[in-house]
Amino acid sequence: MPEVTKLMEDFKAAVAAGNEKQQGWPSAAYAVSKAGIIGMTRAVAEEEKGRGRGVLVNSCCPGYVKTDMTRGGGAKTPDQGAQTPVMLAIGDIGGKAGLFWQNEKVIEW
């Protein structure tokens, strides 16, 4: 996890200095934050695997959901957006961990 934290701190410092684009970072902080979440998911999943407790850690995107955040412009209803998170919480995902999911499928990232 220290590697992911360092990357996020590097991005934060680049933004504070106003030179994130020159350093090769994307212009959207939202995208960088999501990449950080995916990286952290992988790191925590590996830690949990080593503990042998059977805890599965994954991350997911609900999709573009009709919410206040999207000002009602989403293509999915909140119930549709909740399908993948609920599946990850209570469904049989075959012991998969450290992955990124969308539309109830693993997305390579």
Regions found by a protein language model. Give the residues of each.
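Catalytic loop of short-chain dehydrogenase/reductase
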Residues: 1-50, 61
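C-terminal helical subdomain
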Residues: 59-62, 67, 71-109
